[in-house]
């Protein structure tokens, strides 16, 4: 059964309607998962700071919600992911109240606390207060664009899996995911960006719903996400000091893997330029240097990314470091 949000509010002062949505859902006693900087948006409900929760004990994490009829996540990615996981394990409804828009986890059924990610259910309601979100750091909003453009290569990878590995594919989910990305790129390339935070939130929610439709991260996560995860591995392996975000890394990864599709004749030059320019317009990184990585690190990441997950992508069984360098140079990432 496909589970998608029953209520989606994306507007100014939306956070003042949390109680209204709870009433509409006949929910009376929610537990809020939030952070110290976002607790101020909580409307007097019981709360736990997300960094006080032990997430490694998946079986007992449900106990946090024992005395409550629902769970609300208020904040960025981690409070929402932890809230989603507690709600799933305790079989309670989950409401997502994002305070920024850096990735589609605000609406998807995916919990990304571990790798591989964990499938739960999409939020029953998403309440996105644009007054709050537009005040979040520009870096986070730029990262959101990176997460959305990655849908283009993710869907191409999914289609490739269908062709080369007879993988199950959902036309409705794939088309929906790709259209969301194209519409947001069209907007940022042809406007003054005044409505960018609201347009971005709508796109991220749509992307999350495409995942719920497919019951898989496939429509929004492909080779570009593998590249991002590989960079995370490099950070830890080499103790690299960089504050690059998931969405930023996915944006650069999209350019790298789109270059491979371009060389195989499976992507138009115009689409590649659209991807790159839309990232630049919102000041998202498009080079390794902007992410804070040396050339050799991104080369190693691209050549090893295929091994991080059993998922067929344009990386197939891997590419050599020489080929990785060539791709990264042609796409002007290095």
Curated annotation (Swiss-Prot):
Chief location bin: cytoplasm
Transmembrane region(s): none
InterPro entries: G1P_dehydrogenase_arc, G1PDH, Glycerol_DH
Cofactor: binding comment: Binds 1 zinc ion per subunit.
Enzymatic class: oxidoreductase
GO BP: glycerophospholipid metabolic process; phospholipid biosynthetic process
Ligand binding (NAD(+)): 77-81, 99-102, 108
Residue positions binding substrate: 104, 147, 229
Annotated pathway: Membrane lipid metabolism; glycerophospholipid metabolism
Protein name: Glycerol-1-phosphate dehydrogenase [NAD(P)+]
